């Protein structure tokens, strides 16, 4: 049995990059200040980095799965060029009211459902209790709770934070950039 590892689960839009709405082109992808350094530091601290992102724009016909994959590959390489290696990238292309029939469905992977986190747990042998979920929406916190992630972290870099999302979170930080120091402070 492989040894389990702690992970940082990361929402993408509004957590890693500025959420301009249905971001699917390299020109529109803008890393949030400080997140690359934070991700590098989290890797040094021994955490696996796993992106878990709802991409309903695919189901809604805003962009294709191929366009999403091209952007994801670019993001992955951009991070690798800065010494940040992602351990996994999971995405949900579905939406119950999608205009693209192939992706119009109720699924287990779309947050707030925990499917992407459970898949990552099983494939990467993740210690969920020692892990963190970082996102900007209530659905991120709900998915983390359903997957038994130890610490739910809401960030203020995406959509306006709701009281409901704050109540569902264990921590509320201004940005992913603040997470390494927050974890170190907690571990003292």
From Swiss-Prot:
Its EC number is 3.1.3.82. One of its GO terms (cellular component) is cytoplasm. The active site is at residues 11, 13. GO terms for molecular function: D-glycero-beta-D-manno-heptose 1,7-bisphosphate 7-phosphatase activity; magnesium ion binding; zinc ion binding. Disulfide bonds: none annotated. Mg(2+) binds at residues 11, 13, 136-137. The record marks 110 as: Contributes to substrate recognition. Pfam families: Hydrolase_like (PF13242). Pathway: Nucleotide-sugar biosynthesis; ADP-L-glycero-beta-D-manno-heptose biosynthesis; ADP-L-glycero-beta-D-manno-heptose from D-glycero-beta-D-manno-heptose 7-phosphate: step 2/4; Bacterial outer membrane biogenesis; LPS core biosynthesis. Its main location: cytoplasm. Keywords: Carbohydrate metabolism, Cytoplasm, Hydrolase, Lipopolysaccharide biosynthesis, Magnesium, Metal-binding, Zinc. InterPro entries: HAD-like_sf, HAD-SF_hydro_IIIA, HAD_sf, Heptose_bisP_phosphatase, Histidinol-phos. It is found in: Cytoplasm. The record marks 53, 111 as: Stabilizes the phosphoryl group. Gene3D superfamilies: HAD superfamily/HAD-like. GO terms for biological process: ADP-L-glycero-beta-D-manno-heptose biosynthetic process; lipopolysaccharide core region biosynthetic process. Its cofactor is Mg(2+); Zn(2+). Zn(2+) binds at residues 92, 94, 107, 109. It catalyses: D-glycero-beta-D-manno-heptose 1,7-bisphosphate + H2O = D-glycero-beta-D-manno-heptose 1-phosphate + phosphate. CDD domains: HAD_HisB-N. Substrate binds at residues 11-13, 19-22, 53-56, 110-111, 137. Monomer. PANTHER family: D-GLYCERO-BETA-D-MANNO-HEPTOSE-1,7-BISPHOSPHATE 7-PHOSPHATASE. Also catalyzes the dephosphorylation of D-glycero-alpha-D-manno-heptose 1,7-bisphosphate and 2-deoxy-D-manno-2-octoulosonate-8-phosphate in vitro. Belongs to the GmhB family. This is D-glycero-beta-D-manno-heptose-1,7-bisphosphate 7-phosphatase. It comes from Salmonella typhi. The gene is gmhB.
């Amino acid at each position: 049995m492989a040894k389990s590892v702690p992970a940082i689960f990361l929402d993408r839009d509004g957590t890693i990059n500025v959420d301009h709405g249905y971001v699917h082109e390299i020109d529109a992808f803008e890393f949030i200040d400080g997140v690359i350094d934070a991700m590098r530091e989290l890797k040094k601290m021994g955490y696996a980095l796993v992106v878990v992102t709802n991409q309903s724009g695919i189901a809604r016909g805003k962009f294709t799965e191929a366009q999403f994959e091209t952007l994801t590959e670019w993001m992955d390489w951009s991070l690798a060029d800065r010494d940040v290696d992602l351990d996994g990238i999971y995405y949900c292309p579905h939406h119950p009211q999608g205009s693209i029939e192939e992706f119009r469905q109720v699924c287990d992977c779309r947050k707030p459902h925990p499917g992407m986190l459970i898949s990552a747990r099983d494939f990467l042998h993740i210690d969920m209790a020692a892990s963190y979920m970082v996102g900007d929406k209530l659905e991120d916190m709900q998915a983390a709770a359903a997957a038994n992630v130890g610490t739910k972290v809401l960030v203020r870099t995406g959509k306006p934070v709701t009281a409901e999302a704050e109540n569902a979170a264990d921590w509320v930080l201004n940005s992913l950039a603040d997470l390494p120091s927050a974890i170190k402070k907690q571990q003292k």
